[in-house]
Curated annotation (Swiss-Prot):
This is Proton pump-interactor 1. Residues 531-545 have a biased composition (Acidic residues). The keyword Transcription does not apply. GO terms for molecular function: mRNA binding. InterPro entries: PPI1-4 (IPR055282). The lineage of its organism: Eukaryota, Viridiplantae, Streptophyta, Embryophyta, Tracheophyta. Residues 20-35, 374-387, 434-446, 459-498, 505-519, 549-564 have a biased composition (Basic and acidic residues). Interacts with AHA1 via N-terminal region. The keyword Phosphoprotein applies. Residues 90-113, 251-314, 466-526 form a coiled coil.
Amino acid sequence: MGVEVVNSGGFEVAPAPFEGKPEKNGKLDQGKGDDAPINFGSVGELPKNAEENNNKVVNSDAPKNAAEEWPVAKQIHSFYLVKYRSYADPKIKAKLDLADKELEKLNKARTGVLDKLRAKRAERSELFDLLDPLKSERKGFNTMFDEKRKEMEPLQQALGKLRSNDGGSARGPAICSSEEELNSMIYSYQYRIQHESIPLTEEKQILKEIRLLEGTRDKVIANAAMRAKIKESMGQKDDIQGQVKLMGAGLDGVKKERQAISARINELSEKLKATKDEITVLENELKTVSEKRDKAYSNIHDLRRQRDETNSEYYQNRTVLNKARDLAAQKNISELEALANAEVEKFISLWCSKKNFREDYEKRILQSLDSRQLSRDGRMRNPDEKPLIAPEAAPSKATPSETEVVPKAKAKPQPKEEPVSAPKPDATVAQNTEKAKDAVKVKNVADDDDDEVYGLGKPQKEEKPVDAATAKEMRKQEEIAKAKQAMERKKKLAEKAAAKAAIRAQKEAEKKEKKEQEKKAKKKTGGNTETETEEVPEASEEEIEAPVQEEKPQKEKVFKEKPIRNRTRGRGPETIPRAILKRKKSTNYWVYAAPAALVVLLLLVLGYYYVL
């Protein structure tokens, strides 16, 4: 017997269609094709050949046996199995999406780091390829340089010996180059002693030098022999120096080439060092990125494990359904019936005993019910009923009404210079508006709680925007409050200005009285003008001190507005007539110059005549 598994309303149902012909007046309606024997199951015998049917055309309608006369309907057994649906937790799904995005970013970052690392390693290998021949070339120049140095060493030693024999040591006298030179020096010292008149101390010194020169005779002879030997083997001193110069020139060329190669090697070595440093940095970065990626992998694995744990009953139910299908294919009705009864009893016991199980199952079938336009209890949904799962609104359109109204309802930020408290009626208006907003929010929260879907949280729905009339009324109230605040500020400023003007007038009157008293006292005592000049800076100091005292209470307040001052200039001291001094008249010197010139001319004329 075939068992068909069909999905219906969260259950696995095996429908039982009736394939026999309906009865008419208590009898079966027999027709053509009903005379074939009916077997259990959906598979029957194959039809006979067309030739045999043509031979038996006459007796085709006549029944032959009871099975053909009374056909038995095809029997189909129906078994009901509970079906568990998979459930995707939105929190776990969001975490998985976020973890997948993070893993994708880390994979991209890792591939980028790997590409950079490959490029740097290729650059390092290129630098190694350039450095290896240069190092081998420098090694060849080093060997050449060492060979030339070895060739020059005997010549330099010979020159050193020749030079060391010429000069003497710091302690003793100079060693002569030959025995003839030594004899001539000794003879010159002896000649001085014999033929020159010198003091005794100098004579003793000369005798001492002669003895020292005689002591160097053996060395002079040995040096002369060695010099002769060197000349025989290597030639004269000039020839040796020429050879050394030639070899030194070749050595300098080798040295320059070696220095150029060394500079190139140093440059490449610096580049190689920088490349190695970059490679180490990239390797560390790759290590950190790999660690982060491994953590992301482990996080995704944990989240998937949590998701599978929540759907463990779904996987168990799937194995049960597969087993039922296998039993149905095998036509093992007894075991299939036992399995169905056991599963149903298990489900009913869990449904009646555990609340969490009921909530979880209802949560799992909500999507199926909603897709089939059914309500929570399985009946057809009415047109006015809301869907079980609210559709997610677009992020651009899902802006709440508060975000549209609150910025308009907020008053403009007042400047810091005017922190004047608003009057009481304005405060009450603001409180009323705040209370109204709170009431609206509480109402919205209550509505959200009522509309919450069991097992899925609150459905997302758009809040109703505030009407234009209410927004206009709120703006009007705000403008009235602002106007009242401005009037209060103006009144306070006017009162402050009047008080300051009264204080200033009183101080000026006191100053005038003091000045008049001082003038009267000076007239009586006959004071000098110096005292009068000293009074002017004192008055100016008092004028400066007065505004400072007035500004002190202003500093305590935040309001800083420059008050309008009506300064009245105080009368200064009476002007005294200046004393007119008699000045001497400037003498004109040209008046004396003319007679002086005449006198000089007369004297010259008289002298001229006197000489003649």
